[in-house]
Amino acid sequence: MKESPKRILLKLSGEALGENGRLFDQDMILRVGKILSDVAATGAQLGVVIGAGNIWRGRQSQEMDAVTADHMGMLGTVINCLCMRDAVERTGGHAVVFSAIDMPRVCEPYNVQSARQAMAEGKVVFFAGGSGNPFFTTDTAVVLRAAEMQADMLLLAKNVDGVYTADPNKDPNAQLIHDISYAEALERCLRVMDTAAFAMLTEQAIPMVRVFGLAEPENILKVIAGDLRGTVLHP
């Protein structure tokens, strides 16, 4: 019998929440919300980090001050987390948003002990505001939260079904990698996460990272159950 992980951190891209140029696709948002509710209902403890790519991307900033641009991205993650909290609650689950940027009238200030307690209570915990600091990506933020929450597994939902030897959208000979260590992925410059995130993965010895495709939201349940492999990264 497959043993399911007890505590999971999931990274979703902001683009997964939008479609055809829209910031938000309500049908997709509710589908993802229902899946997250279902994951929590299995007894797994679930934390989620969401990017802000549907709202704001750094490359849009042009000549803008870099710190200001990063703050805008952090605020975009708050909007996305509030949206998904609502979706989880509308589909029968319980959820809470913790923000690394204090805004107590909107969401809970981030605190490690409070977030762990909320996960233990069966709530889907959304981590907003990135790491709370500019110049760090949501890749780094999700690894940081995985370490702080003592996660058994980190899931990275992508627009492709795993890690490839090259960009499969550009190279027809690109091959899916099923299993690879953190060190080898970094050495081969495979664009899974940024170097700061990889360094933290290695230092904190996060037990396992699974990279999978989010073509269907149900893939979240499948990868947790072990029915969808994608790519497994490990120390």
Regions found by a protein language model. Give the residues of each.
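C-terminal catalytic "cap/lid" subdomain
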Residues: 1-235
